[in-house]
């Protein structure tokens, strides 16, 4: 997980995962990065808005957000629709683990996001 926070550039995606696990005692969940990114987008929009108290100004500012953060680059200026950004996904599988948790998520396909390294081989799930 090579990405870093736009709110705290010293915080990597791996550190976010580790912090979540140490502070909650629970295994991290796949949505933690995209949930974090909601706050990154909000900060970018509120900062760019002519008046952060004006809903219309904030909504318009979202259309101009183009930043790199916890989920990589999110560009709301390019679509697929105005004000919408697409996260470049990776394919994952939960694999048996010898660590603290019984299973751990491993990246098995990075064809749409080459910045994230492959961590395991894709295995059939119906075997």
Where are these regions (language model features)?
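Short, charged, surface-exposed loops that flank catalytic or proteolytic processing sites
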Residues: 47-60
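Extracellular/periplasmic periplasmic-binding protein-like sensory domains
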Residues: 1-36, 48, 104-126
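Loop/turn elements at helix/coil->beta-strand transitions in domains of secreted/extracellular proteins
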Residues: 23-26, 53, 69-71
């Amino acid at each position: 997980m090579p990405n870093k926070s736009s709110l705290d550039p010293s915080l990597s995606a791996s550190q976010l995962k580790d912090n979540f696990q140490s502070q909650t005692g629970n295994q991290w969940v796949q949505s933690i990065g995209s949930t974090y990114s909601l706050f990154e987008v909000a900060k970018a929009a509120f900062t760019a808005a002519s008046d952060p108290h004006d809903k219309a100004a904030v909504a318009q500012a979202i259309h101009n957000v183009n930043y790199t953060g916890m989920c990589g680059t999110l560009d709301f200026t390019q679509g697929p629709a105005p004000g919408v950004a697409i996260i470049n996904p990776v394919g994952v599988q939960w694999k048996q683990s010898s660590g603290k948790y019984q299973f751990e998520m491993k990246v098995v396909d990075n064809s749409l996001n080459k910045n994230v390294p492959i961590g395991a081989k894709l295995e059939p799930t119906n075997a």
